[in-house]
Amino acid sequence: MKDEQLYYFEKSPVFKAMMHFSLPMMIGTLLSVIYGILNIYFIGFLEDSHMISAISLTLPVFAILMGLGNLFGVGAGTYISRLLGAKDYSKSKFVSSFSIYGGIALGLIVILVALPFSDQIAAILGARGETLALTSNYLKVMFLSAPFVILFFILEQFARAIGAPMISMIGMLASVGLNIILDPILIFGFDLNVVGAALGTAISNVAAALFFIIYFMKNSDVVSVNIKLAKPNKEMLSEIFKIGIPAFLMSILMGFTGLVLNLFLAHYGNFAIASYGISFRLVQFPELIIMGLCEGVVPLIAYNFMSNKGRMKDVIKAVIMSIGVIFVVCMIAVFTIGHHMVGLFTTDQAIVEMATFILKVTMTSLLLNGIGFLFTGMLQATGQGRGATIMAILQGVVIIPVLFIMNALFGLTGVIWSLLIAESLCALAAMLIVYLLRDRLTVDTSELIEG
């Protein structure tokens, strides 16, 4: 490993190390929002609602591909960080090689299994009439690019795992930048419409994946792309998938939860959907910053879990303090100028009032959300597969029974408060799980290596 990477893992002031790992991730999570709206933004110029719907309907498929990337990216990435903390550099090469080619294999399976059934999958997603063919065409490009999309998510995680978060951010920036350039060229210049939007995203992912591969080949002695090293054993598979599977489940279940929430809101009409949509966009930014903060320090926690428990605890304390500061600043803003913030999106006073109310409720849950993110990251970083699995399932499904109960009792107001109640339950569960696993979080390095 490079001396600079070791410095931030082992010696730099805790806050400096936290920002080194987290700031690029914060920027990256915000970029993901841009990524999500780019295609719709450019397609919007064509003023064809069917095309916009087609792109929107494919989001669950993208979530699945991201989840498959997390299966190896998060699972192997946290394992690699722990191996580096234990100074076991040679084993990390085998782990990375297996994960890279395992991800490519998953992508090829997606092509073989999903591509022939693009029309049927589009129909399952809800595409009808003119939207069906458009959605199917978009999916075909998405499926064909699956190996590179999955590989992109894996390699981005690996860059952070070895202490190179800036490389991770550069890769994401390059991908978004290329997509911004390609979308108008392919959509308008070549008159490819929806297919052009899909190709822009696909080519951007291919380019970013190649960027990461070239970087690792030239600069890393702990991540290998040598297929000869892709030799898994029982221990490797266990360490990767006990964290990778929960990360995969979280990606899938969170998308499902969003779908269920939309169904409840739709019952109250466009007024409710529009109000929630505005508040969601406002809460999304601090939420993504906190998510980036918590996910960014996962490699730092994983590394020091194996080498310096005291530093690991200091990192966790610094993150909690930072979450608290972000929360206080956001609450002050919402309760003083929240009405004006919402007013930037609409002049409809009924929507402004409801969206402001929703904003206050959802922003109140920001602290609890942050605790859930942090403790889930801790469980992933320290290899606590069972705890991570429980948290992944809870974060994905606990809101569903809460929604049914609160909707039956209090209507739309109950649906809104369900968000805070669900976050509270998940945060309490996370704290309980961490407390119950406290002995494992302080186990000696020698015991971990031998086990």
Swiss-Prot record:
Entry keyword annotation includes Ribosomal protein: no
Q: Which InterPro entries match?
A: MATE_fam, MATE_MepA-like, MATE_MepA_subfamily, MdtK-like
Where's it mainly located? Answer: membrane
Q: Looking at the keywords, is Membrane present? A: yes
Note the Pfam families from the entry.
Answer: MatE
Task: Provide GO CC annotations from the record.
Answer: plasma membrane
Query: Keywords assigned by UniProt?
Result: Antibiotic resistance, Cell membrane, Membrane, Transmembrane, Transmembrane helix, Transport
- Protein name stated in the entry: Multidrug export protein MepA
Q: What is the lineage of its organism?
A: Bacteria, Bacillati, Bacillota, Bacilli, Bacillales
